[in-house]
């Protein structure tokens, strides 16, 4: 998961990449790996305390952490990561990793939906993606096949989660969210070259 180290509207926000590891059956937190700059130590401390306390991913999404815009966001990256993992743990959202997606590209039963904004598409899209901004998704459902496996992505995963919810509420059953969005896809692509 990618999240800003502090409120996005405050100057100087930098992304951090968080990989949370939990038990599949219980959701108990087992570990974390965070790559970034400012605030990584704070987030590792929070997860270390959660591990010591035997907390689960569902506990993380309910945390109430102190914040000020220069140092954190109202929805701290650890809380957002807890929400993402909880959605997956409860079966509310299936995810797909960049490596898993790469293996499926070219499959005629796969439709890839990029819900980023047009100005973000200039930096490139994943080959074969159908580009529909999140704000226009409801009006463009007829461009998509609800019977195909559908992978939704955005820059980091938040908008694609909302896009997946819209699609699910409109009868799409086989939905997956690209973990880490186009940011993680870019990192994966670089690692393969």
Map each language-model feature to its residues.
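Histidine- and/or cysteine-centered catalytic micro-motif in compact active-site loops
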Residues: 1-2, 116-118
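Flexible, glycine-rich terminal cap/loop adjacent to redox cofactors
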Residues: 1-91
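Short hydrophobic-acidic sequence motifs that mark active-site Asp/Glu residues
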Residues: 29-31, 112, 131
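Rhodanese-like catalytic fold shared by cysteine-dependent sulfurtransferases
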Residues: 58-110, 117-151, 155-193
């Amino acid at each position: 998961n990618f999240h800003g180290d502090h409120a996005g509207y405050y100057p100087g926000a930098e992304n951090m990449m968080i990989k949370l590891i939990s038990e599949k059956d219980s959701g108990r937190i087992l570990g974390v790996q965070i790559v970034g700059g400012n605030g990584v130590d704070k987030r590792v401390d929070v997860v270390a305390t959660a591990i010591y306390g035997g907390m689960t991913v569902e506990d993380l999404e309910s945390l109430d952490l102190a914040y000020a815009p220069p140092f954190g966001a109202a929805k701290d990256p650890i809380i957002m990561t807890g929400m993402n993992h909880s959605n997956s743990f409860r079966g509310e959202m299936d995810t797909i990793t960049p490596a898993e997606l790469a293996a499926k590209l070219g499959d005629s039963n796969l439709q890839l939906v990029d819900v980023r904004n047009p100005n973000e598409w200039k930096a490139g899209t994943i080959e074969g993606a159908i580009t529909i901004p999140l704000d226009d998704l409801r009006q463009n459902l007829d461009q998509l096949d609800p019977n195909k496996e559908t992978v939704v992505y955005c820059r980091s995963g938040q908008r694609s989660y909302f896009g997946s919810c819209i699609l699910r509420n409109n009868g799409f059953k086989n939905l997956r969210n690209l973990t880490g969005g186009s940011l993680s896809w870019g990192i994966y692509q670089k690692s393969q070259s």
